Amino acid sequence: MKCAYFDANQCLSCRHLKTPLSDQVAAKTATLAALLKDLSVEQWLPPVVGPESGFRNKAKMVVLGAAHQPILGLVSPSGEAVSLCDCSLYPQDMQQLLHRLEAFVRQAGIPPYRVDKAKGELKFILLTRSQVRGEYMLRFVMRSEQAIPRIERELPRLLAEHPEIKVVSVNLQPVHMAILEGEEEIFLTEATRLEEEFNGVPLYIRPKSFFQTHPEVAAKLYLSARKWTRELAPTSIWDLFCGVGGFGLHCASKEVALTGIEIEAEAIACAKMSAETLGLDKVRFTALDSTSFASDSRGEEKPELIIVNPPRRGIGEALCHSLSEFAPKAILYSSCNPKTLAKDLHCISGYRVTKVQLFDMFPHTDHFEVLVMLQRIGE
């Protein structure tokens, strides 16, 4: 992949851009193998890769410059404000829309937030794309409600020009800190969610719902999870840190009892909607902390399979101990941080690692996703 930003030393996020993709994946595989070397992995499946450009479905743009000349991008290593609207990680239609949004901010006269002076209004523009429909969710992260009338004044023209924008909202983040978003979301459109689909499973995205950024690789990740689960044929599943339900809904069926737990209420609302669309009635999604749920469920009937898909910090010692105590037949662990994955796997007792597969969700970086199947010793 060629990148003028990287060549000009303006953006170095894709730090391994000059390394062939096959070599990147080989290095990631070696890193993972070294971390799991003490676990006697029974089967290493081939790594999964996808397009190295034009794949990303989410843009997080810092708004820089001034109201009359806004820049959507980042501050370069030299301190220069750089527009990233032409970033090759984004599909062409997203690049074009980002350019239009720079013009929108200028036409609306919204002053970008200045961190050094703690002045201004617009902090970030967050743009999310549904790959199945090519539709968008647009979020303006603002310091206050002061400039919302300016957005509302220009919005009808933007939506007329770009009917693919289905959801528009303002997120209020009043704190002078490096925090991406605040608690309050104000919708400026009737629609409040995007529709997405992977492998025939409908998923819904709301503003604060976590979603994978590489749709093609994510679809293959979900397929592997489904295949491995169906080989075990569990009758009951817990999906912890379930998000919008991607893993659990791929692994569920009308005969399987599925319980999904996620602390973010918006994501749970989306998961419930997907289950209803699929006609699954043995499903329960609840907004709770996953570790607390597991701890509070001791003494209750345990599932045959537990799926965990935690944030980068991993599942932690307390949940590792709960899983060891529950002793389900199998544990399916999806991780975006191999270091915390390795730490957690060493902490869970009574299991053997039967399958491991790497998914190159973040090309040109050191990051990747891993799917691991654990089966109880003796099963």
From Swiss-Prot:
PROSITE patterns xrefs: SAM_MT_RNA_M5U (PS51687), TRMA_1 (PS01230), TRMA_2 (PS01231)
Active site: 336
Keywords from the UniProt entry: 4Fe-4S, Iron, Iron-sulfur, Metal-binding, Methyltransferase, rRNA processing, S-adenosyl-L-methionine, Transferase
Extent of the signal sequence: none
A molecular function GO annotation: 4 iron, 4 sulfur cluster binding
Keyword Iron-sulfur: yes
Species per Swiss-Prot/TrEMBL record: Shewanella loihica (strain ATCC BAA-1088 / PV-4)
Binding positions (S-adenosyl-L-methionine): 212, 241, 262, 309
Protein name: 23S rRNA (uracil(747)-C(5))-methyltransferase RlmC
InterPro entries: 23SrRNA_MeTrfase_RlmC (IPR011825), MeTrfase_TrmA_AS (IPR030390), MeTrfase_TrmA_CS (IPR030391), SAM-dependent_MTases_sf (IPR029063), U5_MeTrfase_fam (IPR010280)
Protein family (similarity comment): Belongs to the class I-like SAM-binding methyltransferase superfamily. RNA M5U methyltransferase family. RlmC subfamily.
Keyword Metal-binding applies: yes
GO biological process: rRNA base methylation
CDD domains per the UniProt record, alphabetical: AdoMet_MTases (cd02440)
NCBIfam families according to UniProt: meth_trns_rumB
Residues that coordinate or bind [4Fe-4S] cluster: 3, 11, 14, 87
Catalytic reaction equation(s): uridine(747) in 23S rRNA + S-adenosyl-L-methionine = 5-methyluridine(747) in 23S rRNA + S-adenosyl-L-homocysteine + H(+)
Recorded coiled-coil stretches: none
EC number: 2.1.1.189
A Pfam family it matches: tRNA_U5-meth_tr
Entry function: Catalyzes the formation of 5-methyl-uridine at position 747 (m5U747) in 23S rRNA.
